[in-house]
């Protein structure tokens, strides 16, 4: 190879190298504030998780643009779902989801499915715990069920035909206990209503009731999971999350876990999805996130890509069956 050819080849290599650097430098990232929708009211588990993510991203400088959390809980989340559905291709919009992702369209017939969105990542699964006021006479599942067979107990929850309501119906079917379901705007409000004695019992998520448990205002009876929660640190002087027995071990054969996942509108690119997957992985590695997981006793299952989509397919069908059994499907 002559000198001139070698020089030309060297120049080509240099140009290609520069192009690669330019492509790397131009990897997609948000160019304006990212709107972060919560399809539920303030103070509940989804709201707390979204605001924790927002704070972690800001504190650790994980993204150049800020996150702006907005609560859009109208219609049991339908307000948020339909708005995100309409914003195809908007990569500056995130949605944190509950299992209302399935229950709301199935119960109301609203024209929406999770397939109208782009799944980004499952962050965790949220537990449900059966709670009573500490001033109540019920110290076990058996005592609560016995009371529910002689009188209708008021069960507080976060929405008609939603997750809490499904569990309430399942408890009644499994035990013969009777409940009057009283819906509120969010899990935070439900916990306050239990503390105030306005309802007899709830099936709140741990993070929604933990402050009241620490204060000695509410008592956990069981967790609706197949195994105890793996968090041994004491929350009260005598109990940790791990000390709460499973409902099945107490004779109540009902299990239910709730999705905590992140979605984007349809029509976004794989590169844009990858940006947020990587961002959320960085969030999950922080001490603040680990503290949230322990405080809220979350099941830390995390999925993305094809695994997440397969899980969503299965859960949608499971919810269809559960809601059919409860008589909750839209007609």
Model-derived features: positions:
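C-terminal lobe and pocket-closing loops
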Residues: 125, 209-285, 314-317
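Ligand-binding pocket segment of bilobal, Venus flytrap-like solute-binding proteins
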Residues: 73, 145, 156-160, 164-243
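N-terminal signal peptide c-region/cleavage motif recognized by signal peptidases
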Residues: 20-24
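Hinge/capping helix and adjacent helix->loop/strand transition within the periplasmic-binding protein
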Residues: 83-92, 105-189, 247-249, 259-292
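An extracytoplasmic/periplasmic, membrane-proximal ligand-sensing/linker region
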Residues: 31-33, 214, 270-331
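Bacterial N-terminal signal peptides that target proteins for export
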Residues: 1-16
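N-terminal (or domain-start) structured segment
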Residues: 27-116, 152, 176-205, 212, ...
């Amino acid at each position: 190879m002559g000198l001139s050819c070698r020089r030309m080849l060297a120049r080509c290599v240099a140009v290609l190298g520069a192009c690669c650097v330019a492509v790397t430098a131009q990897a997609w990232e948000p160019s304006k504030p990212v709107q972060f929708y919560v399809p539920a009211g303030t103070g509940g588990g989804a709201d707390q998780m979204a605001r924790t993510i927002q704070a972690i991203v800001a504190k650790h400088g994980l993204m150049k643009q800020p996150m702006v959390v907005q609560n859009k809980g109208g219609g049991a989340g339908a307000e948020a779902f339909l708005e995100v559905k309409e914003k195809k291709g908007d990569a500056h919009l995130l949605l944190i989801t509950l299992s209302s992702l399935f229950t709301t369209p199935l119960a109301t017939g609203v024209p929406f499915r999770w397939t109208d969105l782009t799944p980004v990542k499952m962050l965790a699964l949220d537990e449900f715990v059966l709670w009573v006021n500490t001033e109540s006479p019920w110290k076990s599942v058996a005592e609560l069920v016995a009371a529910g067979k002689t009188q209708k107990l008021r069960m507080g929850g976060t929405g008609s035909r939603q997750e809490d309501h499904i569990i309430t119906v399942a408890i009644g079917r499994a035990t013969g206990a009777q409940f009057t379901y009283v819906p509120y705007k969010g899990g935070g409000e439900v916990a306050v209503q239990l503390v105030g004695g306005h309802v007899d019992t709830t099936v709140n998520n741990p993070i929604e009731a933990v402050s009241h448990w620490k204060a000695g205002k509410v008592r956990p009876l069981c967790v609706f999971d197949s195994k105890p929660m793996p968090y041994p640190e004491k929350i009260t002087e005598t109990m940790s999350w791990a000390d709460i027995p499973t409902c099945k071990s107490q004779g109540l054969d009902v299990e239910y876990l709730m999705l905590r996942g992140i979605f984007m509108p349809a029509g976004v690119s794989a590169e844009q999805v990858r940006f947020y997957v990587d961002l959320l992985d960085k969030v999950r590695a922080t001490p603040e996130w680990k503290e949230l997981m322990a405080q809220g006793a979350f099941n830390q299952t995390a999925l993305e890509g094809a695994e997440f989509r397969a899980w969503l397919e299965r859960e949608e069908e499971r919810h269809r069956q559960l809601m059919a059994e409860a008589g909750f499907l839209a007609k």
